[in-house]
A protein has these predicted regions:
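Bacterial Sec-dependent N-terminal signal peptides
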Residues: 1-28
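Single conserved hydrophobic/aromatic residue that forms the stacking wall/gate
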Residues: 321-331
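Low-complexity, Ser/Thr/Pro/Gly-enriched N-terminal "stalk/linker" regions
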Residues: 26-84, 94, 114-118
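Loop/turn-rich, solvent-exposed surfaces of beta-rich toroidal or solenoidal domains
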Residues: 313-317
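Aromatic-lined, polymer-binding surfaces characteristic
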Residues: 81-82, 92-95, 109-277, 286-312
Length: 331
């Protein structure tokens, strides 16, 4: 009897623990997984917070660690800060321009927008430690174009609220970039983007720089949604990084302004350009493997997280094609 009791007690304890452990496992399984939107909103915030929280206080250049490639070409390393800020804001602008709401995401957007507005001011204030490298370097044209693109995409939320001094400083900095003579590549569109933003903002703009760039890119269309990056076609992702977005956006601005009649350029048609970008979007969609990866080809492959920019623009503009379905592209 004593022997039975000796074994019975551990058995009873074990029987009591098993359901408890099982219940604990069920509770763990019931932890709410983030939605796709919550996941990507979190990624956006983690990318943007270190840059904008520092730059809003004029501390980006002080605190940002810069690593140079072993094949670095010797250019001024301060171009890094403009590249960092400009490309971040070009991608971030549509999201943080959404109306405020009471969600966690809404609070994140509001905070980033507040930091961004302060950072824009720091970028053009000669007294700021984070005054960007606007002068001398030719590379500045590239990254300034992404800042201009952020203003195009978030005009009411990011440009309009800036004070008059900051706005005039941007107009001055953008205007002096005409000193850069862009090569006959996608660089023509950097000039066109800057000048079309000036037009949108009501500042003096160089219409020739816009029109000549758009005409040249139109000449470079090779078919099936692809543009050549200059006279010779290159199989890379620059149709995603530059050619489609920075062809569509200036063309839309100038078409809405009625400027295409002034240019007498019926060859540059906005609706046709959209159809080409839709076709390119289908190709991009079919590049994606079942594992969610993209094929690696062409130069600047480290930028490949930007390869889906045309798809993002189409979705944002409600211009997504019907096959594959919009839901597939969101997934």
């Amino acid at each position: 009897m004593n022997l039975n009791r000796h074994y019975l007690l551990p058995l009873l304890i074990a029987m009591l623990l098993i359901p408890a452990q099982d219940l604990s496992a069920k509770k763990k399984k019931q932890v709410k997984e983030p939605t796709d939107r919550e996941l990507w909103a979190g990624v956006l915030y983690r990318m943007a917070e270190p840059v904008l929280s520092n730059m809003s206080e004029g501390k980006l250049q002080q605190n940002m660690l810069v690593e140079l490639s072993p094949t670095w070409d010797g250019r001024n390393k301060k171009v890094t800060y403009m590249e960092c800020f400009g490309r971040l804001m070009a991608g971030l602008a549509p999201w943080i321009s959404l109306p405020d709401d009471d969600t966690v995401e809404g609070a994140q957007r509001k905070q980033l927008r507040e930091w961004a507005l302060k950072s824009y001011a720091q970028a053009v204030s000669p007294e700021s430690p984070d005054y960007l490298l606007w002068r001398k370097e030719g590379q500045t044209l590239v990254d300034a174009a992404y800042i201009a693109e952020s203003f195009i995409r978030g005009y009411d939320a990011l440009w309009v609220p800036l004070d008059s001094v900051t706005k005039q400083r941007y107009i001055t900095e953008f205007t002096q970039l005409r000193r850069v003579d862009p090569p006959y590549t996608n660089w023509l569109l950097f000039s066109a983007t800057v000048e079309s933003f000036l037009c949108k903002a009501g500042a003096p703009s160089d219409t020739y720089r816009i029109a000549s760039a758009l005409r040249k890119v139109e000449e470079w269309y090779v078919g099936d949604g692809w543009y050549s990056d200059g006279p010779d076609f290159a199989f890379d992702y620059y149709n995603s990084f530059v050619l489609h977005p920075m062809y569509i956006e200036p063309l839309e601005i100038m078409t809405n302004a009625g400027k295409n009649k002034v240019w007498n350029m019926p060859d540059c048609d906005y609706n046709r350009a959209v159809k080409r970008m839709q076709r390119f979007g289908i190709i991009l969609e079919r590049f994606i493997s079942p594992e969610g990866t993209l094929p690696i080809f062409g130069r600047s492959i480290t930028y490949r997280t930007g390869t889906l920019q045309p798809l993002a623009l189409l979705a944002w503009s409600c211009l997504l094609y019907t096959s594959p379905s919009p839901r597939d592209k969101r997934q």
